[in-house]
Amino acid sequence: MKTSRIAGLVIILVVFVSLAAIWFYPSVQAFMANNTMWNGINKFSKEFNVQNVDSISALPTTPGQDVLIAVPYEQYSPTELIQMKQFIENGGKLIMMDDFGYGNSFLEYAGIPARFDNTPLLDPLFNYKNENFPRIMDFTANITGSGIKGVVFNHGTALRDVAQSQALAWSSNMSFLDTNQNGNWDQDESKGPFVVAASYNLGKGTLDLVSDSSPIINAVAGNNDNKLFVNYLINSNGTPDKVLFDRSHVTKSPLDASKIQLANARRVLSNPYTLVGIITLVFVIITWYVYRRGLLIGGS
């Protein structure tokens, strides 16, 4: 066997093994659907049959009853702000779950007065395990009527400038915003109750705000009534046609970026027209190779 042929086979084997490793190696990055560890959203994605969106421009222009979940860890571009607002105004629902404040740029653009405070919300009395896991137990009548008694946050924040008519849930009066982040309440720090969830009508659609993104991660989704609360938000306007998750604004590792590219390639290759094209190309290459071999053998 020629050296070039051996080298070619080795290259093919290396590529195949690399692609298999990328495909099957589990993700450990937060908010990744194939991450089964504590910070992934594997359970949430399966429960609500979530479809990932890797670009805001890919959002449907006529969303109908579609629901988009956004966990912004990066700033939105001006074009993305326009597209997100159009998604809501055309009838879609956006549930923005944020504790870092990156979602405030959209709130400002959309003319919504509320803001994510971006200061840690602690509760030394009403909590799960410790003050960093505030237990939310004060809700509107509709939410309470749906059987929700308590929701657990994980290093969340609060919402500012929310009118009473827009509020959905509040922290306890023992909660406080830990401005200096020393873990204790100080005289100059604000005490609760604070609004932690709110809802706004925008055009034909709805914008819901939750000041913590952790209720959908694997480790927290099963605590108290977190799953019921997320289910209430998703279905409050009726059963959605699709539940979408904005994957374009969460932090991705090189492995996750490669997984996404590989999944996109697989999706393209699974298209019937693409398969016909590939089969035709392979047939032409094999025919040409056999023909060339025949000429070489005949010439010798």
Predicted regions and their residues:
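Short, surface-exposed patches at the edges or C-terminal ends of soluble domains, predominantly
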Residues: 1-300
